[in-house]
């Protein structure tokens, strides 16, 4: 049976935390900041944790993530 492939798009977007959860950067945080409030920009700086409902689906894309 051939080796499973890691989904490269998911590998670039998700990192594993020390406790085993997956974190990712929020959307809308790369440009066009003049149109965003200070509060919105502050919240965009903090990474988000993958919800339990999505965890299994995303973990299947990252087959070799330890």
UniProtKB/Swiss-Prot annotation:
The keyword Ribosomal protein applies. GO terms for cellular component: cytosolic large ribosomal subunit. One of its GO terms (biological process) is translation. Pfam families: Ribosomal_L35p. Keywords: Ribonucleoprotein, Ribosomal protein. GO terms for molecular function: structural constituent of ribosome. It comes from Lysinibacillus sphaericus (strain C3-41). This is Large ribosomal subunit protein bL35. NCBIfam families: rpmI_bact. It comes from the Bacteria. SUPFAM superfamilies: L35p-like. Belongs to the bacterial ribosomal protein bL35 family. The keyword Ribosomal protein applies.
